């Protein structure tokens, strides 16, 4: 997707992030419109209304960017059958395997450890995993991810001009965040590499695959001046990098 010279991307929140649901962000440069993460099926009407409120229609959306494939980020992809879907194949394949194993009634607790090897390092590990399984069994539907022909794997193809994918893989393998490089104000769409500005522990509904990398990803994001859009919190601006203890 090539842009007109001087075209600048703007970021607009369509669905605000919360501990219950992921943020969905519209990236628009006037001629081209993309959505970062599409949310859950029960949010479809809210997403469609937000698109209309932005002066657009679902058919105007030229592309989807999935930060990763947890259920709260991808299950409205199917609302956009003509859109290219930019994502990491590593994240896609990992999550497809995870959700398949979570459906195993006899062995799911044992199987989940191969995806989340640090599970027992967390006090509420069993609660986290039981919630994950409950949500997966209720909502997971691979048909809602979109057609295989729509996918553009970032391992082989770059994002549209002016947007850059940064791998932030502490949350899940292949997780990507989006750097909006040529906007009026630099913006960083974090996905779940940054759940919220300052209360990740309060809304941690998913155990990171790699806690050390997850913390490094968080610090990386918070070291950037500009507008920050977390996966499960309100967006905020940083004028200068904060000082970490």
Where are these regions (language model features)?
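Active-site metal-binding motif and surrounding structural segment of the metallo-beta-lactamase
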Residues: 44-91
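Conserved beta-strand hairpin/beta-sheet module of binuclear metal-dependent hydrolase folds
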Residues: 1-53, 177-195
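Divalent metal-coordination and catalytic microenvironments
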Residues: 27, 37, 61, 68, ...
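Short loop/helix-cap segments at secondary-structure boundaries that form the rim of catalytic
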Residues: 5, 75-81, 238-242
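Metallo-beta-lactamase
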Residues: 42, 90-167, 209-226, ...
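Short, acidic/turn-prone active-site loops that include or flank metal/cofactor-
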Residues: 89-93, 192-195
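Hydrophobic "anchor" residues on beta-strands that sit immediately upstream
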Residues: 33, 64, 84, 188, ...
């Amino acid at each position: 997707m090539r842009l007109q010279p001087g075209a600048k991307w703007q970021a607009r929140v369509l669905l605000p992030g919360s501990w219950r649901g992921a943020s969905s962000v519209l990236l628009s440069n006037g001629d081209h419109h993309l959505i970062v993460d599409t949310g859950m099926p029960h949010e479809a009407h809210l997403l469609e209304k937000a698109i209309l409120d932005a002066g657009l229609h679902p058919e105007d959306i030229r592309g989807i960017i999935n930060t990763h494939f947890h259920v709260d980020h991808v299950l409205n992809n199917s609302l956009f059958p003509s859109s290219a879907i930019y994502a990491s194949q590593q994240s896609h394949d990992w999550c497809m395997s995870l959700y398949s194993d979570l459906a195993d009634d006899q062995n799911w607790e044992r199987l989940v450890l191969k995806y989340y090897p640090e599970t027992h390092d967390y006090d509420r590990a069993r609660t986290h995993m039981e919630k994950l399984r409950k949500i997966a069994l209720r909502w997971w539907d691979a048909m809602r991810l979109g057609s295989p022909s729509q996918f553009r794997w970032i391992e082989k193809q770059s994002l549209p001009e002016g947007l850059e994918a940064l791998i932030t893989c502490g949350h899940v393998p292949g997780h990507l965040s989006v750097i909006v490089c040529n906007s009026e104000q630099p913006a960083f769409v974090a996905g779940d590499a940054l759940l919220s500005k300052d209360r990740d522990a309060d809304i941690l509904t998913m155990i990171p695959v790699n806690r050390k990398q997850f913390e490094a990803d968080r610090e990386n994001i918070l070291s950037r001046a500009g507008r920050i859009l977390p996966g499960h919190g309100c967006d905020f601006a940083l004028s200068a990098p904060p000082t970490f203890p």
